[in-house]
């Protein structure tokens, strides 16, 4: 939901590792999701560059010992789970105790990381859930310490589920076979008519000249033939107009939807099937990016004075979450696509 609208409405706001909040002017207490330190950057300097105030830098410094290697920089070390999650939860608890923002977002990626690396259901994921339970308890104790436990709505959400993978396929290899991609003798990309970009268990196909009717028709025919054969990881090809009707728009011309066990690679060099790679979320042992009705569904749980007890929704649309939260705060969201989940509210 709109942090800017909450600022206008007069609420104080906080965000810890919530995606795309870097230097967000409407966040009063901000510790941004910090992935990629620049060369020569210090830990505190990096967070400051992403919008953390001096007050937040003190909290970061206090909890720095929880980071891998005490916060020595480097993407792999800094974003190592669950250490980074211990750090960010501790920071969030300190913000709650010291500043009590009226609206706060906290994001950890421990379960997401475990599923990418090991699959959807396994002992590693169960251990990750135990840690999530621990962190929720820490946040609740921080609310209790601040005196706001019983007047706070606590909501647990997820942006997606995941499905297990059996393989990772490279559609661009077959584009090259069809003459849609040209490579030199060393396998370097020389030119292209159509190019497939991975979104994990879906993929966007771009045309170099989207207005070229012949290129469009040739690419569509190649994709439909591949889908009909059923061996290339997808059995459905959506046009841009079809995906736009479902809420997905962009500069692409087509979208490929997974067969349910295949992820897609952007690479154009053989072999056409690539090995799993735990360092890239698209190619781990489980991932996301598919149509939302597939697979285990993302989480939504809520407790607090604004919510009715023992209410169960069989399903809901993720776009309904922000309007529901806005309704709790009395913040208008006139441009929102979703609706308020009234059944949940007192």
Segments from the language model and where they lie:
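A long, amphipathic alpha-helix that forms part
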Residues: 82-104, 111-152, 220, 224, ...
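His/Asp/Glu-rich, glycine-adjacent segments
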Residues: 1-119, 224, 265
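Short, solvent-exposed loop/turn segments at secondary-structure junctions
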Residues: 19-23, 110-113, 162-163, 212, ...
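Secreted, luminal/periplasmic, and some membrane-associated catalytic domains
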Residues: 4, 138-276, 280-282
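Structural recognition of the beta-strand scaffold that forms the well-ordered cores
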Residues: 13-17, 103-107, 154-156, 204-206, ...
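A short beta-strand-to-alpha-helix junction
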Residues: 127, 184-199, 210-222, 295, ...
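A structural signal for well-ordered alpha-helical segments within the folded catalytic domains
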Residues: 1-4, 22, 86, 90, ...
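Low-complexity, glycine/alanine/valine/leucine- and proline-rich hydrophobic stretches
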Residues: 269-322, 327
């Amino acid at each position: 939901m709109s942090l800017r609208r909450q600022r206008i409405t007069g609420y104080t706001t906080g965000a810890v590792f919530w995606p795309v909040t870097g230097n967000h002017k409407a966040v009063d207490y901000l510790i941004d999701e910090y992935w990629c330190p620049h060369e020569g950057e210090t830990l505190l300097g990096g967070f400051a560059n992403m919008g953390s105030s001096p007050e937040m830098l003190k909290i970061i410094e206090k909890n720095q010992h929880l980071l891998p290697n005490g916060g020595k920089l480097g993407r792999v070390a800094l974003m190592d789970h669950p250490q980074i999650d211990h750090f960010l939860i501790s920071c969030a608890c300190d913000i709650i105790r010291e500043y009590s923002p009226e609206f706060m977002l906290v994001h950890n990626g421990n379960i997401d990381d475990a599923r990418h690396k090991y699959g959807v259901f396994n002992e590693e994921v169960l251990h990750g859930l135990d840690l999530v339970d621990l962190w929720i308890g820490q946040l609740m104790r921080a609310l209790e310490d601040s005196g706001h436990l019983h007047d706070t709505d606590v909501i647990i959400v997820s942006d997606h589920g995941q499905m297990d993978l059996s393989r990772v396929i490279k559609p661009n290899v077959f584009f090259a076979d069809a003459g849609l991609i040209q490579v030199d003798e060393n396998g370097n990309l020389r030119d292209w008519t159509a190019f497939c970009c991975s979104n994990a268990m879906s993929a966007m196909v771009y045309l170099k000249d989207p207005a070229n009717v012949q290129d469009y028709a040739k690419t569509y025919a190649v994709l439909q033939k591949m889908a009909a054969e059923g061996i290339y990881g997808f059995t459905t090809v959506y046009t841009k107009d079809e995906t736009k009707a479902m809420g997905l728009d962009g500069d692409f011309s087509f979208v490929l939807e997974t067969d349910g066990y295949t992820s897609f690679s952007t690479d154009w060099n053989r072999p056409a099937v690539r090995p799993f790679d735990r360092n890239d979320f698209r190619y781990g042992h489980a991932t996301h990016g598919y149509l939302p009705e597939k697979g285990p569904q993302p989480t939504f749980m809520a407790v607090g004075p604004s919510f009715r007890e023992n209410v169960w929704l069989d399903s809901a649309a993720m776009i309904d979450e922000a309007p529901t939260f806005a309704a709790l705060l009395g913040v208008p969201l006139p441009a929102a696509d979703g609706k308020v989940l009234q059944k949940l509210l007192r």
